[in-house]
Structures are given as structure tokens and as C-alpha cells.
């Protein structure tokens, strides 16, 4: 909150300080009004009906959540490089609902599976931004509450699928250090999670440093060198304080206008850091490879989240859920003396011609533990999305489905949703 207050104060001070000599006769209030009046409105409306079925104790029924996300934002006109952005988000329950958010007392239903879309209204973003070219290189500084994404979201994400996005009170710097290379540094002071501000774990303080050097070469390879230093300020989260260093390379590698090689290779090492009382030394591996042809992609993938014990394992507390849309593997699992997660998967995606604007994705997962090689089950996911271009380029409808077959972990689960979204 202190970062947010500082950013608003700085923006108000920037208006009179940024006036040119020829503007000296114009009152600061009039200049401020002009900047505010000539801004840009943004809107994101998404109605979704989501259902989640899980077998076994303690669940006695299915969850269903008909929710409407209304996110309205406003960005001021740039004034001597300064601009400001503010966004509020409201989540409404439209129709009969029955689902659980365990850390939100008003919506805690222990006998129902979790769907993390709480009803409520909150300030989701509010920051001051300054942009300036420095010797031909772009320089951007942002101060305040903002959404931050690192690469594919494995370690830091906004969790855009949920109705409330994750955001941070943060200071961020982006600078072009070379022709096709950008350096990013961010200091994260507080995290606001997707379960909402009123949840017992909806917000927490931390001292985190994010560093990322991303570059592109020959339009065939994108490389990212990153570091994430997390130091939590509350005792229950001390065990999540870690230092993660990693490297990531992605394609596609274009062979000709029709064919390409789709690939991703990533490695990261995580160690205990700051207030963490435990010993942590865990690795993360990701490998994807497959052909791309005329807008279609086929990939085989392998992901490993290392784990030796319940305290010595890879943790990703700021990430969005990976490894299946049932979200059962949102965190690294533990089963007795078996820890960590190995996911092998096949995925196919592409455009559904001749329906312009329609895409589909299908993925099959097979799960094992990292230690002891216990089979955790398998999952089949598919998604359909259709941009209704004949009516509006801003309108999309779609569905998402995930079915998990249990083995030695969890119980059978089915999560499905349909949605309609309008973005401006």
C-alpha cells in the first residue's frame, strides 16, 4: 500500500514539475485535468460457469460457480513521459452457486471442491509509469500495484484464468540493453492473490527481487536468464523463502513458410533463502519438442519439479496452476516418502478451419513422483475458443475441460467450464 500511495503522490507532483516554460501561465490543476480527460478506458467482462467434481472424502457434492468478472481500467494520457493507470475488479455471482474457498470464511464449504473465484470488489491495479528513451534505448519505470508475469508464468504469474488476477505492490524497471535484449528488475513488496483480499491468505508481505534478461536472435530463438529471490515476512510462509536461478530458450525455429520446429528448453535451480529455516536444493526441468505446420502444433513435453522431502522440494507460490486444468497439481505433491512431480505430456493445438477465429487445444498428461517413481495418475484436457469476428473482434466464447484419473494420489476429478468474454 505504501508503494501505491507513493506512486499516486509522485504522479500528482509530476504534473506541475513537468510544465514547460511556455506552460508556466497555465495552472497545474488545468494541466492535470487535461491529462486525466484525454486518457483511455479499458474493460474486461467475462461470464463463466464452472463446475468441479471430485470423488471421495470429504466431498459430498459437486461445486458449481456462475461468476461474472467486471474489470474496468483507466490510463491517463502521457505527460512528459508520465502516465498513470488504475483498475478495479468486481466478481459477481449470477445464479445459484455452491462452491468452496477454504480460506474465505464466508465461502468455506469443506464438503465441496475448491473453485477460487470469490465474490467481491477490489482495487486490482494502480500505478504510475514513466517512459523515456535513453541514448536510443527504451526505459520504463512503474511504481504501484501492478500485474507482473515472468516468461510463461511458472514462477511469477497473474493467473489470468481466474476471475481475480494476482497483482503486486511493486517497483519495476524495464530497459532495452541491446537491439533485441531487455533487462527487467522488479522489487515486490506485497502480493494480492486470486482468492481475494478478504481471504486469510489473500495478501501477504514479502521482500522479493525479480531479475530477467530476455533476448531474441534471428527470430528463431528467444533466451531468458532469470533470477527470483523470495523472502517472506510472516512466519507461516518462511518455508517458501527461496532463491531461484534459471535459463529458458524457446522457438519456433522456422524451416520455411509452412513448417517449423516448436521447442522449449528450461532449467532452474532453487535454494533456501532469507528467512527459510529449511535446507532446499531442488531443480526444475522443462523440455518440449514437436513440428509446427500451417498454424497447427504438435509437441511432446517433459516437466520435472524436484523433491526429496516435504521441505526440500521446488515451490512456486507466485505461479499460476500448471500440469493440468483440474488444478490438482497447483503445488508440488507429497505422498508418504514420495515427493516432487514428473509430468510427461502430448499436446496438439491449431486453428479450426474454415471457422475463422476458432482454435482448439488437446493435452494428455501422465504423472509420477520425482522420488520413488510412484504413479500419480493421468489427465486429459481440451479447450475450444472462438473469436466472434463477424460481430466483434473483442468478443470471445469458449470452453475448457479437464478429466483426471487417479492412481496413488488424490481421487478422480472432473473440471469443466464455458465462458463468454468481451475485452476492450
Model-identified regions with their sequence ranges:
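Cleavable N-terminal export/targeting peptides
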Residues: 1-31
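Beta-barrel outer-membrane channel/assembly domains of diderm bacteria
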Residues: 21-141, 171, 175-176, 249-268, ...
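Signature for the C-terminal beta-barrel architecture of outer-membrane proteins
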Residues: 22-25, 135-139, 158-311, 344-346, ...
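Extracytoplasmic loops and strand-loop junctions of Gram-negative outer membrane beta-barrel proteins
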Residues: 24-26, 53-58, 107-112, 153-156, ...
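Solvent-exposed loop/turn segments at secondary-structure junctions
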Residues: 91-93, 147-150, 192
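Outer-membrane pore/translocation modules
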Residues: 96-119, 307-340, 415
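Small/polar (Gly/Ser/Thr/Ala-rich) solvent-exposed segments
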Residues: 144
Amino acid at each position: 500500500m505504501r508503494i501505491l500511495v507513493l506512486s499516486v503522490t509522485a504522479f500528482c507532483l509530476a504534473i506541475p514539475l513537468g510544465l514547460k516554460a511556455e506552460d508556466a501561465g497555465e495552472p497545474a490543476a488545468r494541466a492535470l485535468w487535461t491529462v486525466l480527460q484525454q486518457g483511455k478506458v479499458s474493460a474486461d467482462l467475462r461470464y463463466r460457469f464452472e463446475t468441479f467434481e471430485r470423488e471421495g472424502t470429504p466431498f459430498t457434492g459437486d461445486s458449481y460457480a456462475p461468476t461474472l468478472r467486471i474489470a474496468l481500467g483507466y490510463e491517463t494520457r502521457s505527460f512528459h513521459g508520465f502516465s498513470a493507470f488504475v483498475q478495479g475488479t468486481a466478481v459477481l455471482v449470477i445464479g445459484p452457486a455452491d462452491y468452496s474457498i477454504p480460506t474465505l470464511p464466508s465461502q468455506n464449504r469443506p464438503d465441496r471442491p475448491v473453485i477460487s473465484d470469490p465474490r467481491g470488489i477490489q482495487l486490482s491495479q494502480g500505478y504510475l509509469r514513466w517512459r523515456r528513451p535513453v541514448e536510443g534505448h527504451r526505459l520504463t519505470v512503474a511504481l504501484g500495484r501492478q500485474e507482473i508475469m515472468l516468461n510463461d508464468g511458472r514462477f511469477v504469474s497473474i493467473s489470468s484464468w481466474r476471475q481475480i488476477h494476482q497483482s503486486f505492490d511493486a517497483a519495476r524497471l524495464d530497459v532495452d540493453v541491446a537491439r533485441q535484449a531487455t533487462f527487467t528488475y522488479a522489487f515486490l513488496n506485497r502480493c494480492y492473490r486470486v482468492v481475494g483480499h478478504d481471504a486469510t491468505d489473500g495478501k501477504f508481505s514479502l521482500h522479493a527481487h525479480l531479475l530477467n534478461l530476455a533476448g531474441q536472435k534471428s527470430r528463431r530463438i528467444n533466451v531468458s536468464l532469470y533470477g527470483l529471490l523470495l523472502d517472506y515476512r510472516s512466519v507461516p510462509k518462511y518455508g517458501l523463502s527461496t532463491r531461484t536461478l534459471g535459463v529458458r530458450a524457446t522457438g519456433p525455429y522456422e524451416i520455411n513458410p509452412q513448417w517449423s520446429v516448436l521447442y522449449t528448453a528450461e532449467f532452474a535451480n532453487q535454494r533456501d533463502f532469507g528467512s527459510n529455516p529449511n535446507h532446499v536444493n531442488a531443480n526444475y526441468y522443462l523440455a518440449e519438442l514437436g513440428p509446427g505446420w500451417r498454424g497447427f502444433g504438435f509437441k511432446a513435453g517433459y516437466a520435472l519439479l524436484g523433491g526429496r522431502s516435504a521441505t526440500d522440494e521446488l515451490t512456486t507460490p507466485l505461479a499460476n496452476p500448471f500440469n493440468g486444468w483440474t488444478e490438482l497439481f497447483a503445488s508440488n505433491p507429497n505422498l508418504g516418502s514420495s515427493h516432487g512431480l514428473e509430468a510427461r505430456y502430448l499436446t496438439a493445438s491449431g486453428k479450426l478451419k474454415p471457422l475463422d477465429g476458432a482454435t482448439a487445444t488437446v493435452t494428455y498428461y501422465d504423472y509420477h513422483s520425482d522420488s520413488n517413481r510412484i504413479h500419480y495418475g493421468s489427465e486429459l484436457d481440451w479447450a475450444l475458443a472462438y473469436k466472434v469476428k463477424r460481430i466483434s473482434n473483442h468478443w470471445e466464447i469458449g470452453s475448457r475441460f479437464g478429466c483426471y484419473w487417479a492412481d496413488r494420489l488424490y481421487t478422480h476429478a472432473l473440471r469443466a467450464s464455458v465462458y463468454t468474454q468481451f475485452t476492450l
